[in-house]
C-alpha cells in the first residue's frame, strides 16, 4: 500500500489542497491519503479553533472520497505537546502502517522552511517527499538539487491566506474552497474581520 501523508494547518482547507490530493493519487500513485491537521510552529495562528480545522479537514476528506480515493483525517498532532513535529507524525504513521510506502506531501512554501524542521534526515529515512510547486515559479536550487525530493508542478491559484482575506472582506469563497467548507466557514462565522 502507498500512503500519502498530507499535513498542514488547513486554516482553512481549499481547492488547492483538494487538487494536491487528487494529483497525489494519480502521480505518486497513492492508494490512501492521511490528512493530518496540525499547528505550524513557524506561522502564527489565524482564527479557526482546532475543532473547526478538524471539522473542515473532514469535509475535505469527504470531497476526496467522492472521487474514489480513500482519505481519512487525524488530529494526532493536535493531541501532542506543542509544537508537534512532522518526523514524530511519520514515526506514528509508520508504527500504525509498518508495511506501507509513505510519501510526505508538502507545498513548496512549506518546503522552503524544511531545513528548520526538526530532524529533516529522519523525515527522509521514514518517507519519500513530494513537493508541489506552483507552475510559473522558478524552481529553487534547494529543491532542484535534492534527489530525495520529487517535484510536482502544480497550478493552484488559491491559498488559505487568500481565503481568509476574501472572507474578512465579504467576498465570495465560491471556487476557492469546496462548497461544504464554504458553508461551514459561513455558518461558523470564521475569518470575519475583527
UniProtKB/Swiss-Prot annotation:
Coiled coil: none annotated. Pathway: Cofactor biosynthesis; NAD(+) biosynthesis; deamido-NAD(+) from nicotinate D-ribonucleotide: step 1/1. Keywords: ATP-binding, NAD, Nucleotide-binding, Nucleotidyltransferase, Pyridine nucleotide biosynthesis, Transferase. The keyword NAD applies. Its EC number is 2.7.7.18. It is an enzyme of class 2 (transferase). One of its GO terms (molecular function) is ATP binding. GO terms for biological process: NAD biosynthetic process. PANTHER family: NICOTINATE-NUCLEOTIDE ADENYLYLTRANSFERASE-RELATED, PHOSPHOPANTETHEINE ADENYLYLTRANSFERASE. Belongs to the NadD family. This is Probable nicotinate-nucleotide adenylyltransferase. It comes from Chlorobium luteolum (strain DSM 273 / BCRC 81028 / 2530). The gene is nadD.
